[in-house]
C-alpha cells in the first residue's frame, strides 16, 4: 500500500487535507476535507508542478502527460489530473473518490505535484470554448498543496 497526503492552503480562508492511497497497481482512493469554501461545486485537479513559491499559480497547468484535452474523470479523453468537482455544504467539502488514471508511482505519479481547489465549478470540458478544453472554466485557484508520501 502506498499512501500520500496533501495539506491545502491559500491566501484566503480556504484550507484542507487530502489523503491518497493505492494498493499495488489498483486505482487511487482520494479522501479529503476542505474548509472555507462557498457552497456548491468547485473544480479539483492535480497540477503539473509541486511549486507553490508564487502561490498556487506556480503549480502550472493540469497534469497532462498525454497531451489530451480537459474532461470529466469518467471520460476517455481527459488530463490525468482531472478529478472533477468537490461539493461544499456549509463551507465544507468532504469527499471520497476513486480514480484509475492517477497513480502514486510510475508515469502517472502525482507525488511531488500540487493538488488545487478552484473557485468555480469545473464544466468538465463541455463548456463549448477553448478555456473549457484547458481548465474546465474552473476559475481562480483558492488553495493548493504539494502531494507527498506518508506512512
Swiss-Prot record:
Its EC number is 1.15.1.1. A lipid is attached at residue 6 (S-palmitoyl cysteine). Gene3D superfamilies: Superoxide dismutase, copper/zinc binding domain. CDD domains: Cu-Zn_Superoxide_Dismutase (cd00305). GO terms for cellular component: cytoplasm; nucleus. It is an enzyme of class 1 (oxidoreductase). SUPFAM superfamilies: Cu,Zn superoxide dismutase-like. It comes from the Eukaryota. GO terms for molecular function: copper ion binding; superoxide dismutase activity. Its cofactor is Cu cation; Zn(2+). Zn(2+) binds at residues 62, 70, 79, 82. Disulfide bonds join 56-144. The keyword Zinc applies. Coiled coil: none annotated. It catalyses: 2 superoxide + 2 H(+) = H2O2 + O2. Destroys radicals which are normally produced within the cells and which are toxic to biological systems. Belongs to the Cu-Zn superoxide dismutase family. This is Superoxide dismutase [Cu-Zn]. It comes from Xenopus tropicalis.
Amino acid at each position: 500500500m502506498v499512501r500520500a497526503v496533501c495539506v491545502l492552503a491559500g491566501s484566503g480562508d480556504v484550507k484542507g487535507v487530502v489523503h491518497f492511497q493505492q494498493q499495488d497497481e489498483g486505482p487511487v482512493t482520494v479522501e479529503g476535507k476542505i474548509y472555507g469554501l462557498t457552497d456548491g461545486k468547485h473544480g479539483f485537479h492535480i497540477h503539473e508542478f509541486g511549486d507553490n513559491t508564487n502561490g498556487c499559480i506556480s503549480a502550472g497547468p493540469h497534469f497532462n502527460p498525454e497531451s489530451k484535452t480537459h474532461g470529466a474523470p469518467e471520460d476517455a479523453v481527459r488530463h490525468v489530473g482531472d478529478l472533477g468537482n468537490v461539493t461544499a455544504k456549509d463551507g465544507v467539502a468532504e469527499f471520497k473518490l476513486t480514480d484509475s488514471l492517477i497513480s502514486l508511482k510510475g508515469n502517472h505519479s502525482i507525488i511531488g505535484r500540487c493538488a488545487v481547489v478552484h473557485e468555480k465549478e469545473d464544466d468538465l470540458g463541455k463548456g463549448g470554448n477553448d478555456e473549457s478544453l484547458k481548465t474546465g472554466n474552473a476559475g481562480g485557484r483558492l488553495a493548493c498543496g504539494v502531494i507527498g508520501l506518508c506512512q
